[in-house]
Amino acid sequence: MKPSVILYKALPDDLLQRLQAHFTVHQVANLSPQTVVQNAAIFAEAEGLLGSNENVDAALLEKMPKLRATSTISVGYDNFDVDALTARKILLMHTPTVLTETVADTLMALVLSTARRVVEVAERVKAGEWTASIGPDWYGTDVHHKTLGIVGMGRIGMALAQRAHFGFNMPILYNARRHHKEAEERFNARYCDLDTLLQESDFVCLILPLTDETHHLFGAEQFAKMKSSAIFINAGRGPVVDENALIAALQKGEIHVAGLDVFEQEPLSVDSPLLSMANVVAVPHIGSATHETRYGMAACAVDNLIDALQGKVEKNCVNPHVAD
């Protein structure tokens, strides 16, 4: 008999069929307590779990005594209790490589749209304000040859640095847990402490996962150290930034503009002050949101679960020592 798995995110038909070729697949709408209670027998027998955007915590794991692996359709896994999974010897798989280039594209789009005020001036045109040749109140700022500070030089940071260095001749500063020799050799990137990066960068791009150490890493103190002309970009995780401090920095003119793909609470509240600011470009966590990349992520997650339940954890595993 095939192992039983629970799918809590819709898949394209071909990927669902791939999953069904290996497992008995039970589809549920979400992982809410109500759903778990209504499908208690299914959860009790499931050996695998696949989906995204739901919390997987110790309380859920108590209801899934046979669970051996969970696969998320994402690179981030801050919604998983990794300690609880590891304590129960449950593998956690994710999709770290599939979305790199697409998220870097999104970051570069935020850099360009904030600097050149693309969203703001497009709305002014639609509102009928373009009635004569434009003047300085429509102007943006250059991107080329401006200094880009990258906080978090992982795969996505490297892909962004490549675009900025070769495409826009931007000097690159970076801050990370360790020196990145390849970034320094390929892009002439310069490692520096966070304070130096904040003080010298024209654009500050935050690309960090959410951990206990990175929560609210950016607050009033950090924004106060940035140039008043600086543009701040966040496409990592929303809670890495103290959103109230960001709002205050924008309102006080401590920084110039923000381009945001992630927020402390998602979806962003309709009454958030960020939505009424002309100097904010806010998009709904679209970092990896292309048809091609989302399909690739789903395919990777399916293959990850198949591999994990077959004892193959050579790649894409957050806690591979569980398999030892």
Swiss-Prot record:
Fetch the InterPro entries from UniProt: D-isomer_2-hydroxyacid_DH (IPR050223), D-isomer_2_OHA_DH_cat_dom (IPR006139), D-isomer_DH_CS (IPR029753), D-isomer_DH_NAD-bd (IPR006140), Glyo/OHPyrv_Rdtase_B (IPR023756), NAD(P)-bd_dom_sf (IPR036291)
Q: Which domain of life is it from?
A: Bacteria
Gene Ontology terms, cellular component aspect?
cytosol; plasma membrane
The enzyme class is oxidoreductase
Coarse class of the primary localization is cytoplasm
Catalytic activity from the UniProt record? glycolate + NADP(+) = glyoxylate + NADPH + H(+); (R)-glycerate + NAD(+) = 3-hydroxypyruvate + NADH + H(+); (R)-glycerate + NADP(+) = 3-hydroxypyruvate + NADPH + H(+)
Instruction: Print the keywords alphabetically.
Output: Cytoplasm, NAD, NADP, Oxidoreductase
Catalytic residues of the enzyme: R237, E266, H285
Task: Name its cellular compartments.
Answer: Cytoplasm
For this protein, what is the EC number?
Answer: 1.1.1.79, 1.1.1.81
Q: Which GO terms describe its molecular function?
A: glyoxylate reductase (NADPH) activity; hydroxypyruvate reductase (NADH) activity; hydroxypyruvate reductase (NADPH) activity; NAD binding
How is the quaternary structure described? Homodimer.
Q: What does this protein do?
A: Catalyzes the NADPH-dependent reduction of glyoxylate and hydroxypyruvate into glycolate and glycerate, respectively.
What protein family does this chain belong to? Belongs to the D-isomer specific 2-hydroxyacid dehydrogenase family. GhrB subfamily.
Q: What is this protein called?
A: Glyoxylate/hydroxypyruvate reductase B
Q: Which gene encodes it?
A: ghrB
